[in-house]
UniProtKB/Swiss-Prot annotation:
Top EC category: transferase
Assembly and oligomerization: Monomer.
Cofactor comment text: Binds 2 [4Fe-4S] clusters. One cluster is coordinated with 3 cysteines and an exchangeable S-adenosyl-L-methionine.
Protein's gene: miaB
Family: Belongs to the methylthiotransferase family. MiaB subfamily.
Protein name as it appears in the record: tRNA-2-methylthio-N(6)-dimethylallyladenosine synthase
Alphabetized UniProt keyword annotations: 4Fe-4S, Cytoplasm, Iron, Iron-sulfur, Metal-binding, S-adenosyl-L-methionine, Transferase, tRNA processing
Function: Catalyzes the methylthiolation of N6-(dimethylallyl)adenosine (i(6)A), leading to the formation of 2-methylthio-N6-(dimethylallyl)adenosine (ms(2)i(6)A) at position 37 in tRNAs that read codons beginning with uridine.
Length: 451
C-alpha cells in the first residue's frame, strides 16, 4: 500500500472519548506514512468520528458526508470513513444512505484502523461494528496537545439510562489494567505532559469487570485504588478525570481526591434532572438528595472545589413543577459550569417510544430559562476568584489576543493573562486574578511554579 504524499483529515464530533479515539487513529495514520491536513478538501482520506448522543450532531455528520460524497464522484480515489457512534448504530444501513462510503467502523475498532484500511485499499467496502474485546493501547496517539493528554481507562457502559444510546454503541464496560494505565502515564510524563485526564463513559465504575475482590468484599481494583496507584507518576503534576456517575461516586473516592495533591479540585458529575420521579424514569439510579449529599461532602473536604455537570430539559412527561425542581437544584448548588441540552429522542432507546413527548417550543423555553440561571450562578461563583492567586497551566496563545496566553486553573477555569507563549507554554504559573466572568478569568503573572 503506497501512502506517499497522501493526506488525511479527521473531523471529531462529541465527547472527550471520541477526541481520544481520534488521537489514537491519527497516530495509526501517521505510522502508516500519511500526512495530516487541516483542510478536508485537500485530503485523500477523510474520517468522520461521529456522535449520536443528540440528533443535531448526527445530522451535521450527514451534511458533511453529502458534500464529500459529491466530491468522490469527481475524485474516485478519495477514501471516506465513518467511525464512532453513528457508525456503530447504523452499521451497513449507512451504505444505503451514503453508498460512496469505503469504511464504517464502530468505536471498539479504532485500534484496527490500519487493518481495515488495508482491506479498503484492496478494493473492499468494509463494515466493522461487531463487538470485540478491546486490547491494550499499543499505538502512540498523535496528541493535539503537548501539555495535556487524555488516557482511556475504561471503555463502554453497563448502565441503561432510558434516553441514552451509549451502551448500545460503545458496548459493555471493559477496564484496562492498572499496570497498562500507569505505563502509559509514565511514558507521557517522560514526554513532558504535565496534566492527564483519565477518561471513561462511567469512570467511577472502573475495575468492576476486572478479577478479584478484597477481604472487605469490594472489587480488588476500583477507581479510587487506581488514583492512589498512579498518583506518583514522575513528571505528571495534575490529574483530572471524567465522566463520573453519581451512583458510584463514593465517600472513599472523595476522600482520596482531597488527600492526593495531584488530583485537581474539579468534579464533573452529571445530575440530568433535579426531580426524583424523572430520575427514576431516566433509570439513573439515584435521587436528587443523594446527589446533593455528594456535593456537600466534596465541599466539606475541598471547600474551593469546582463542580460541573450535565442536565436535560424537556424529558418525556416533564411537568413545569418537575422542571422547577431542576432549577431549584441548580440554584441551591451553584455550578461552576453546566452543560445543558433539550431532550432529543434517540433511536433504539425506551424514552424515544413514549407517548408523552414534549413540544419543541416547551423544550426551547425551558432550556433558555435554565441557561439564564446557569449564567447567573456561574457569575456568582466566579466572584470568589477576584484578587486571588491561582495556579495556571499555560496551554496556548489567546486566539483573540496575541499578547495574551491562556490556560486553566486547578478548578478548570479558563484564564487569560499577558505573556510570551514561547516562554510560558507548558509552564505552571501563579496568576493574580484581576477580572472575572461567568466562565473565564483574566489575571497577571506573579511567579513561576518550580516542579
Amino acid at each position: 500500500m503506497n501512502t506517499n504524499n497522501r493526506h488525511y483529515h479527521i473531523t471529531t464530533f462529541g465527547c472527550q472519548m471520541n477526541k481520544a479515539d481520534s488521537e489514537r487513529m491519527a497516530g495509526i495514520l501517521d505510522n502508516m506514512g500519511l500526512i495530516s491536513s487541516e483542510d478536508p478538501n485537500k485530503a485523500d482520506i477523510i474520517l468522520y468520528n461521529t456522535c449520536t448522543i443528540r440528533d443535531n450532531a448526527e445530522q451535521k455528520v450527514y451534511s458533511y458526508l453529502g458534500r464529500q460524497a459529491k466530491r468522490k464522484h469527481k475524485q474516485p480515489d478519495l477514501t471516506l470513513i465513518v467511525a464512532g457512534c453513528v457508525a456503530q448504530q447504523e452499521g451497513a444501513a449507512l451504505l444505503r444512505r451514503v453508498p460512496e462510503l469505503d469504511l464504517i467502523m464502530g468505536p471498539q475498532h479504532a485500534n484496527r484502523l490500519q487493518d481495515l484500511l488495508e482491506q479498503v485499499f484492496n478494493g473492499n467496502q468494509v463494515v466493522a461494528t461487531e463487538p470485540i474485546h478491546i486490547v491494550e493501547d499499543i499505538t502512540k496517539p498523535r496528541r493535539d496537545s503537548k501539555i495535556t493528554a487524555w488516557v482511556n481507562i475504561i471503555y463502554g457502559c453497563n448502565e441503561h439510562c432510558t434516553y441514552c444510546v451509549v451502551p448500545s454503541v460503545r458496548g459493555v464496560e471493559q477496564s484496562r489494567t492498572p499496570e497498562a494505565i500507569r505505563a502509559e502515564m509514565e511514558e507521557l510524563g517522560r514526554q513532558g505532559y504535565q496534566e492527564i485526564t483519565l477518561l471513561g463513559q462511567n469512570i467511577d465504575a472502573y475495575g468492576r469487570d476486572l478479577p478479584g475482590v478484597t477481604k472487605e468484599g469490594r472489587n480488588k481494583y476500583t477507581f479510587t485504588d487506581l488514583l492512589y496507584y498512579v498518583h506518583d507518576v514522575p513528571g505528571v503534576e495534575r490529574i483530572r478525570f471524567a465522566t463520573s456517575h453519581p451512583r458510584y461516586f463514593t465517600e472513599r473516592l472523595i476522600r482520596a481526591c482531597a488527600e492526593l495533591p495531584k488530583v485537581c479540585e474539579h468534579f464533573h458529575i452529571p445530575f440530568q434532572s433535579g426531580d426524583n420521579k424523572l430520575l427514576k424514569a431516566m433509570a439513573r439510579g439515584y435521587t436528587h438528595e443523594k446527589y446533593r449529599r455528594i456535593i456537600d461532602k466534596i465541599r466539606e473536604l475541598m471547600p474551593d472545589a469546582s463542580i460541573s455537570a450535565d442536565a436535560i430539559v424537556g424529558f418525556p412527561g416533564e411537568t413545569e413543577a418537575q422542571f422547577e425542581n431542576t432549577l431549584k437544584l441548580v440554584e441551591d448548588i451553584g455550578f461552576d459550569q453546566l452543560n445543558t441540552a433539550a431532550y432529543s429522542p434517540r433511536p433504539g432507546t425506551p424514552a424515544a417510544l413514549w407517548e408523552n413527548q414534549l413540544g419543541e417550543e416547551v423544550k426551547s423555553d425551558r432550556l433558555q430559562r435554565l441557561n439564564h440561571l446557569v449564567g447567573v450562578k456561574a457569575a456568582d461563583r466566579s466572584q470568589r476568584y477576584m484578587g486571588r492567586i491561582e495556579e495556571v497551566l499555560v496551554e496556548d496563545m489567546n486566539p483573540k489576543n496575541a499578547a495574551q496566553v491562556m490556560g486553566r486553573t486547578r478548578g478548570n477555569r479558563l484564564t487569560f493573562f499577558e505573556g510570551d507563549i514561547a516562554q510560558l507554554k507548558g509552564k505552571l504559573v501563579k496568576v493574580k486574578i484581576t477580572e472575572v466572568r461567568p466562565f473565564s478569568l483574566t489575571g497577571e503573572v506573579k511567579e513561576f511554579v518550580l516542579v
